[in-house]
Curated annotation (Swiss-Prot):
This is Nucleolin. The modification N6-acetyllysine is found at residues 9, 15-16, 96, 102, 109, 116, 124, 322, 352, 381, 402, 448, 471, 480, 516, 524, 575, 580, 649. Its main location: nucleus. Identified in a IGF2BP1-dependent mRNP granule complex containing untranslated mRNAs. Component of the SWAP complex that consists of NPM1, NCL/nucleolin, PARP1 and SWAP70. Component of a complex which is at least composed of HTATSF1/Tat-SF1, the P-TEFb complex components CDK9 and CCNT1, RNA polymerase II, SUPT5H, and NCL/nucleolin. Interacts with AICDA. Interacts with APTX. Interacts with C1QBP. Interacts with ERBB4. Interacts (via C-terminus) with FMR1 isoform 6 (via N-terminus). Interacts with GZF1; this interaction is important for nucleolar localization of GZF1. Interacts with NSUN2. It comes from the Eukaryota. It comes from Rattus norvegicus.
Amino acid sequence: MVKLAKAGKTHGESKKMAPPPKEVEEDSEDEEMSEDEDDSSGEEEVVIPQKKGKKATTTPAKKVVVSQTKKAAVPTPAKKAAVTPGKKAAATPAKKAVTPAKVVPTPGKKGAAQAKALVPTPGKKGAVTPAKGAKNGKNAKKEDSDEDEDEEDEDDSDEDEDEEDEFEPPVVKGVKPAKAAPAAPASEDEDEEDDDDEDDDDDDEEEEEEDDSEEEVMEITPAKGKKTPAKVVPVKAKSVAEEEEDDEDDEDEEEDEDEEDEEDDEDEDEEEEEEPVKAAPGKRKKEMTKQKEAPEAKKQKIEGSEPTTPFNLFIGNLNPNKSVAELKVAISELFAKNDLAAVDVRTGTNRKFGYVDFESAEDLEKALELTGLKVFGNEIKLEKPKGRDSKKVRAARTLLAKNLSFNITEDELKEVFEDAVEIRLVSQDGRSKGIAYIEFKSEADAEKNLEEKQGAEIDGRSVSLYYTGEKGQRQERTGKNSTWSGESKTLVLSNLSYSATEETLQEVFEKATFIKVPQNPHGKSKGYAFIEFASFEDAKEALNSCNKMEIEGRTIRLELQGPRGSPNARSQPSKTLFVKGLSEDTTEETLKESFEGSVRARIVTDRETGSSKGFGFVDFNSEEDAKAAKEAMEDGEIDGNKVTLDWAKPKGEGGFGGRGGGRGGFGGRGGGRGGRGGFGGRGRGGFGGRGGFRGGRGGGGDFKPQGKKTKFE
């Protein structure tokens, strides 16, 4: 009856009864701490009040009362306030606005009371009291109906969650300004004036429902709460369990926000990374522009723009003493006199060459016939631009001409080689060396001229023609560098005076087609020469007539050079020469100086006495240097002794050792059983290599004794 009397109070009085006193809040906190640990199975009941909130517009008044009490129970927990402050409090009144007219004046007050409950504590009583005031006396039946409605609505809990989630978001957008701030002071005054006469049993039941609803709301709504700041609500009367849960939710929110921030940052980074990629082409263009500045500079050596027509010719041997304008005028007039119109003339910055553009291919072909005409006293060269032909391609269609007269000119060669597109005379110190490179349009033309013009007489001398490039190297290896075959046609001249020149030798060997006097880096003769003839008969004749002839105070020695790689060669060439027949007084320094181009010399000595064994080794940088030195010093003398030369056997072939030979005599460092030096290959051997007299890497089987026989004890 007391409850009914209180229910009859005015709305103003119901306001005072709405929120619970602070003492009840503290009691409820203690109860909540214990209930949070015990009640884990009541999560399904939490959604039940939400379902009733949905039915408030269609069910009878009795159910409306129940639904509002439960509706107030769902949004009021402090946990919910911590996650979504102001959002839930505003959402509930918004839904109540749909209820009958009686409820309309109350939502504002209820909203204030609910906001009060949201801010300090999950006061369940505060939520129930406004429901009683709103219905004016029907709260007596409310509590009895709670249990009935709980049983009826358990099956619909999942649907309530979905429906509430659907309705809450639109309400949240318009409700963010929390009305709790102005309403909270009034509710606090009402708490002080109001003495709650309700039974403790009602409080317990309502608080149990509230705790269950708190747990359920906490688990259902964290996703919504993460977008709203949780700092708005002052945490005064939260229990320890709620604070821990709030901390966990806050951490989850922070993690979610961090993840979102990271995703945003990643998106921004990707956009920033995409922009440089887009900008990269611009940078590359700039870089390529810089890189192309060097080639551009080369292109800019040609005065003027790019070719105006596809029909252009290269013009060379211009007079560099004239200006660009003078050259252009003279070249244009030259073609005009021959009924050819030059569309454009572009000269190089050095004014030694240029390019001329024509209107048609016919004009271009006619202009080619004018090569050799003079412009400012110089005979111009006209030819098609070479383009980007590789060196290999050009070498394949180029011939090397030897045994030319030292006074021959390019014009004289052009008369013989009419198909040549370019002729380059080789000179040294302003004087011709008697050789020239003759380039043709194609490799077939080069082969044709080699066959037809080989041995042709030019200015009283028989010319010798050779291939260049890889083709010429193959011919050298096979001994077919020309049409000649059979015996060697080259003589090796040694003991030559250092003052003798190629011209001096040319006067002696009149039939020679090519003469070469190797020189050291200082331009001084190395004391030997190669003299090539047109045939083996000519070479043999010169050998018989000129051997041991005196030239410039020294007696020369001549011998036939065996073709490289031929079976007549005594052994395989290498970078090391074996020298036998040395005097005991010959030192390594003397031995090295005796061979021009040598880099190191070693004399083999007796391990016990230290005296010379009478032989040694001389190293060179290349096989060519070694071969030239060998041919020059063949049958030569060192310190009055005539020496014998041979190639040092490569590693693993036995015979006289290579680089390790001089270290330890026959036994090398290992004594009489081999070791690293001596006869055993490249310093590994002795007669038996490391293993002794028989076998091993050095291998005694290939050793051919030269000189006296050596016995080991």
